[in-house]
Amino acid sequence: MANIINLWNGIVPTVQDVNVASITAFKSMIDETWDKKIEANTCISRKHRNIIHEVIRDFMKAYPKMDENRKSPLGAPMQWLTQYYILKNEYHKTMLAYDNGSLNTKFKTLNIYMITNVGQYILYIVFCIISGKNHDGTPYIYDSEITSNDKNLINERIKYACKQILHGQLTIALRIRNKFMFIGSPMYLWFNVNGSQRRMKAEREIARKNCGGNPCERELKSERSNVKRLEYQLDAEKEKVKFYKRELERDRYLSSRYLTSSSDPHEKPLPNYTFPRIKNVSPLTTEATGSVEVAPPSTDVTEPISDVTPSVDVEPEHPPAF
């Protein structure tokens, strides 16, 4: 069995039959998870990850013999990147034709913006990989570019393909708000690609597209508006509390004043209470300024009352407002 290094270098492996077992397992997995909705905590199980891993490895092993005049002078793995070789790959052919082409038929009905179920997610990402096509339908590398010596061109093509794999999955993750669903891209899509830079760039592009454009920004503005509305309501409630406290103080003040000056010997005054004092006016006199001694309570009153000699600046006959 050829190892990955030999496959990469174009060393032709011993002819092997297509591993139909991995295709059968893949078909069963898709049927099993096709209607399973992706929730916030949904992830791909270890069993299903192993099946995906086997499918991609079997696809890589089955690449056809490369033409001597159709190899990359830059060492790029064109056997997995171009339609010229992928369409000759027996594993790819078998996968598309399996079960009367049911998998390929389902794949053609999907796009990155409508995926909501686990089976749809797995089928779409895996078929994009083994078909050598980006999510926008363009090939990883055009057949005419197989023998290109333009290093920048080939590197940019592969970087774009790698970005599309990350971009598509990040788009789904942000839309569904799930951070556990992910299928890693095969190693040949990382040819001359800086992984950390590519990941950060893809995340920035997704954030700019989704949050700077529509849904995230609208949700954020809505949340900010709700917070402001609640703050206004809280301030209004605080003002109400202050108002009721002032009213309570005023009522207690008036009650104490009239009770302490009452001639009814059986009327019980309020308990001792210290009133706010405002300079130069007494509410118990007809003078604009001055103070009045409050008469002591009736001797029949059992509870003592302290002298009240408020001095406030208000008109006579009218209590002060607090």
From Swiss-Prot:
Region feature Disordered, mapped onto this chain: 284-322
Annotated Pfam families: Pox_A30L_A26L
Function: Encodes a truncated version of poxvirus A26 protein.
Family label: Belongs to the chordopoxvirinae A26 protein family.
Name this protein carries in UniProt: Putative A-type inclusion protein
